[in-house]
Curated annotation (Swiss-Prot):
Residues 624-744 are annotated as: Spacer. One of its GO terms (biological process) is regulation of transcription by RNA polymerase II. This is Retinoblastoma-related protein. Residues 422-875 are annotated as: Pocket. Belongs to the retinoblastoma protein (RB) family. Keywords: Cell cycle, Nucleus, Repressor, Transcription, Transcription regulation. SUPFAM superfamilies: Cyclin-like. It is found in: Nucleus. Residues 422-623 are annotated as: Domain A. Residues 745-875 are annotated as: Domain B. Its main location: nucleus. GO terms for cellular component: chromatin; nucleus; transcription regulator complex. It comes from Camellia sinensis (Tea plant). Disulfide bonds: none annotated.
Length: 1025
């Protein structure tokens, strides 16, 4: 199926890489052998590849330890693959050029990796090292737009999506069909164990790839592709011989009956897989067209056919192909589909997606991309198990059944009614919310919203509508048939693209109007007035809302071609602007599906940890007002954000290209492909819900005033302050902040969020490293002091880089036997860790005052620690040294920092009280939450009187028998007849459920309240009388 190139014996490198006169082939000779013998490149491509290799090979010797396992031979193979992948993607001759035919230039990424003996997962994990090091060379050779043309993050997102979809398809196929074509009623155990893939399974996947290639065009989002797979599944059910079925239409509870006509196949699949019946029918029609065009099969209306396959199936609207999967035609159909795919993708340099039909293929790799750019999987989860493992896709988020199913006689679902959540099922559930709740809304302001818009000093309705249309057209550009428009990873090449963009644009528009109305209502209640002129005439506020709405739509569909932060570029705002809006959105997030709440949580964290600190962030514009002492360094590094492009400028660009928007000058130039550390950015990093505590404090309240620290219960929560100050001019006084400017309020709130985020990460590392609470306090105080007194250390850097250096610095002054390697290994053991953060740290040598070094570059974390971090923070470290080592360290040489104490900086606070983890609701109908209990809190929490209500790992309430018996005993105590204080009856369905929002708020209040105490036992509310 897949083209397998010859596998020559590539000469290997020794530790010297270049073999200086040792008799072995040189580095250049090994690369030439790789190109000529391994991939059979023609002369032009070989010359171009050798040029890029020659200009970048000097970087290889300095990067060996940071690539793979750190061996020269392996690093060399990676570098060869990186160079050839870049040449393939960036060469002008490869840009949609079919003139190459089947020549030597038609090599694919999979062929490169086979010759290099690498797998896809490892390739994408290590690619950022090459990108950040060779970026200037690629820019010189291929132009400044090389990052967009390389499309590394899009290709990686596509790989993750296909990994998820292939597993989803495999599970679905095995639910309906036997894994081997046996005439017996049992599946072949040996076939399942060996990973055997039947020809029917293979045919379905190849037909799906044809659908992706010819019908979905550029927009291959996860939801659309899942609809495609379900459509393929319907075609297989109709055409695969009955002897291979793993179900019975009469007995299976999975199917919906359509009166006396039989099973309504499409309605049944929609119920099982949460798809739209309308979309499913449209996708099936496209697939049928492809069967006709590619396989040259003749279609017939299923109602006119008499086939065993169609018995007991309602055939209305279904198409049947007589000999589609007959034993005689199946082999030729497989060959035709394989050749069609190869011809369509030969010159694109992308993945050969046929490898996913066989999970045993060595190219796929043993791991996942959980810690890299496309972080769809989360901590402790593989690539196919996003979301809470115990959560099902039933209530409260599962929408109602499809219209046709609601009028049919439905058979109650069996095992499929509670399907374990996976990334695909979660995406489909979220998409159904968007389809059933948001899509029916009108694409214009509601009468209530219009009242707010017309109540301003002058009616702003027209301005709001015009702005929304222009910005959303910029994010989801339309394009005429045959036109091509590349915008931040978005390429419109067909009518399908225009339809897709129009649908997403309407969804974002309706969501924007709905949220805007809710925000206006809340703001009017706070101000006791309907005139919101200051807010509703603020351009930045509206663009942030539009960007947030579009991002939620994109996150719902999980597009692989428009990844965050593309919405920032299209709207002209910065990461700091969006972080304010995300904070506001948490006030109104109760109606959002769980996964969109998680997306906002993870987006907030990603913005805070690095993006807000990158060059071009509007945070620096506010910082120079709030902290004038930092203006010189901010200006020297050219960190200030450029002015936001006007609506007229955006509209002008749209008119130039007849409705599509060419790339505008980017306000976040380095955010397109790379973070400031060279890591490929991801649209979704799974974030456990406890992180919502970072943003539950109102985004626009100054922590200096501590207004929100006096609340003890949700009922006593005071109304949040007005939004106007959040998006006002930085120099404008904030009337509700006691004389502060709006910039000071914004920076104080931002710093408080950074402190909270730092506390979470420090606490997690302390636990993994098994350090004492005293060390934790010292590290946390150092982190706070650096933020307030050495703020420039954060400029252009990731906060994890600062945290890691804090750990090592405190370990040194505390005389702990903790090495840098141990700290990094501990961090990298976390699946969410991005190793590039520690392998590539920004350094400006001119500010470091180091002789012989000038300019800017990215270095490893140890170099940064020695050359930049320690000279700046040594005085702070000496002050924080534990008793006994302080005096000794005071006599050491100290170097004064350049920042100094910033006026108005928040005072250093003790380590905050943090929740162990967000409690997880284990049942939709039972009022039961599960949360881990740390041993440090066990003794304080579990008193003698309440100990029998807890089950602790490693400790039983009586002589241990078994875990199940212990849990049963506890449950019996809770639900026994004896009247116990605070007894909770989990079997009563009528008991009021505790909402997720209430739980999140209780955690927030525990962290923020001065009266809260981590050592106080948790008192349960008495629910029975």
């Amino acid at each position: 199926m897949e083209d397998h190139p010859p596998k020559p014996s590539i000469p290997t490198a020794d530790a010297s890489l270049s073999n200086h006169g040792r008799g072995g082939p040189s580095l250049d000779a090994r690369f030439a052998y790789f190109c000529k013998t391994g991939l059979s490149l023609n002369e032009n491509t070989y010359t171009e590849a050798m040029k890029l290799f020659s200009e970048s090979k000097h970087l290889l010797s300095t990067t060996i330890s940071a690539i793979g396992t750190g061996t020269p031979e392996e690093a060399e193979r990676y570098w060869f693959a990186f160079v050839l992948y870049s040449v393939k993607r960036l060469s002008e001759a490869n840009a949609d050029d079919s003139s190459q035919g089947t020549g030597g230039d038609g090599f694919t990424l999979c062929q490169i990796l086979r010759v290099a003996k690498l797998n896809i997962v490892d390739f994408f994990k290590e690619l950022p090292q090459f990108i950040v090091k060779a970026g200037p060379i690629l820019s010189n050779q291929y132009g400044t737009d090389w990052e967009k043309r390389l499309e590394a993050k899009e290709l990686q997102a596509n790989f993750v999506h296909l990994s998820l979809l292939s597993k989803y398809y495999k599970r679905a196929f095995r639910e309906f069909f036997l894994t081997s074509d046996a005439k017996v009623g049992e599946q072949s155990t040996a076939a399942i164990a060996s990973g055997y893939v039947s020809d029917y399974h293979r045919f379905g996947w190849l037909l799906f790839l044809a659908l992706r290639t010819h019908a979905f065009s550029r927009f291959k989002d996860l939801v659309t592709c899942t609809n495609g797979l379900v459509a393929i599944l319907a075609i297989l059910i109709i055409h695969i011989p009955v002897r291979v079925r793993n179900f019975n239409l009469h007995d299976s509870p999975r199917f919906v009956m359509k009166g006396s006509k039989g099973v309504d196949l499409l309605a049944s699949l929609c119920n099982i897989y949460e798809t739209s019946e309308d979309e499913l029918r449209k996708t099936m029609e496209k697939a049928n067209d492809l069967i006709e065009d590619i396989l040259k099969k003749n279609r017939r209306s299923a109602s006119e056919c008499r086939s065993e396959n169609l018995e007991n199936i309602a055939t209305d609207g279904l198409i049947y192909f007589e000999d589609l999967l007959d034993d005689t035609s199946l082999p030729s159909s497989l060959n035709i589909l394989g050749k069609d795919y190869a011809d369509a993708t030969r010159n694109k340099g992308e993945l050969d997606e046929r490898v996913f039909v066989n999970e045993e293929d060595s190219l796929l790799g043993p791991g996942s991309l959980s810690g890299g750019a496309m972080n769809i999987s989360g901590a402790k989860r593989k690539i196919d198990s996003i979301a809470s493992p115990a959560r099902t896709i039933t209530s409260p988020l599962a929408p109602y059944c499809s219209p046709s199913a609601s009028h049919a006689k439905a058979i109650p679902c069996g095992s499929n009614s509670k399907m374990a959540a996976t990334p695909v099922t979660t995406a489909m559930t979220t998409a159904k919310w968007l389809r059933t709740i948001i899509s029916p809304l009108p694409p214009k302001p509601s009468p209530e919203l219009e009242r707010f818009l017309s109540s301003c000093d002058s009616d702003v309705t027209t301005d709001v509508i015009r702005r929304a249309n222009i910005i959303l057209e910029a994010i989801f550009p339309s394009s005429g048939l045959g036109e091509e428009c590349i915008t931040g990873g978005l390429q419109c090449t067909s009518l399908m693209d225009s339809i897709w963009a129009e649908q997403r644009r309407l969804e974002a528009l309706k969501l924007y109007y709905r949220v805007l109305q809710a925000m206006c209502t809340a703001e009017a209640q706070i101000l006791h007035a309907n005139n919101l002129t200051s807010l509703l005439t603020n351009e930045r506020f509206h663009r942030c809302m539009l960007a947030c709405s579009a991002e939620l739509v994109l996150a719902t569909h999980k597009t692989a071609t428009m990844l965050f932060p593309a919405v920032l570029e299209r709207t002209g705002i910065t990461a700091f602007d969006l972080s304010k809006m995300i904070g506001v959105s948490f006030r109104l997030k109760e109606s959002l599906p769980r996964e969109l709440k998680r997306h906002l949580n993870s987006l907030e964290e990603r913005l805070l940890e690095s993006m807000v600190w990158e060059k071009g962030s509007s945070m620096y514009n506010s910082l120079t007002v709030a902290r004038p002492a930092l203006s010189a360094e901010t200006n020297r590094l050219c960190l200030l954000a450029e002015p936001m492009p006007s609506l007229d400028a955006i509209a002008m660009h749209m008119n130039i290209t007849c409705g599509s928007l060419p790339c505008l000058p980017s306000l976040q130039k380095n955010e397109i492909l790379l973070g400031q550390n060279g890591d490929i950015q991801s649209p979704k990093r799974l974030c456990t819900e406890y992180r919502s505590v970072l943003v539950e404090r109102n985004s626009f309240t100054s922590p200096v005033k501590d207004r929100l620290l006096t609340f003890n219960t949700p009922k006593s929560k005071l109304p949040p302050p007005a939004l106007q100050s959040a998006f006002a001019s930085p120099t404008r006084p904030n009337p509700g902040a006691g004389g502060e400017t709006c910039a000071e309020t914004a920076i104080n709130v931002f710093f408080s969020k950074i402190v909270k985020l730092g506390a979470f990460r420090i606490n997690g590392m302390v636990e993994r490293l098994q350090l004492s609470q005293e060390i934790r306090e010292i590290i946390f105080r150092l982190f706070q002091q650096i933020l307030s007194q050495r703020t420039t250390l954060f400029f252009n850097r990731h906060i994890d880089q600062i945290i890691l250096c804090c750990f090592y610095g405190v370990a040194k002054i505390s005389q702990l036997s903790l090495t840098f390697k141990e700290i990094i290994s501990t961090i990298e053991s976390n699946p969410q860790c991005k190793p590039q953060v520690f392998r590539s740290v920004f350094v400006d040598w001119s500010s470091a005052r180091r002789h012989g070094k000038t300019g800017q570059e990215h270095v490893d974390i140890i170099t940064f620690y020695n050359e930049i971090f320690i000279p700046a923070v040594k005085p702070l470290l000496v002050e924080l040294a534990p008793v006994g080592t302080a005096q000794k360290n005071r006599n050491s040489e100290t170097i004064n920092g350049t920042d100094g104490q910033c006026p108005g900086s928040p005072k250093i606070s003790p380590f905050p009280s943090l929740p162990d983890m967000s409690p997880k609701k284990v049942s939709a109908i039972h009022n039961v939450y599960v949360s881990p209990l740390r041993s440090s809190k066990m003794d304080a929490l579990i008193s003698n009187g309440s100990k029998s209500y807890y089950a602790c790992v490693g400790e039983s309430t009586h002589a241990y028998q078994s875990l199940s018996k212990d849990l049963t005993a506890i449950n019996n105590r809770l639900n026994g007849n004896r009247k116990l204080r605070g007894t909770l009856n989990f079997d009563e369905v009528d008991v009021g459920l505790v909402s997720d929002t209430l739980v999140a708020n209780s955690l927030w209040l525990q962290n923020g309240s001065c009266a809260s105490s981590s050592g106080a036992p948790v008192k349960s509310e008495r629910l029975d009388s």
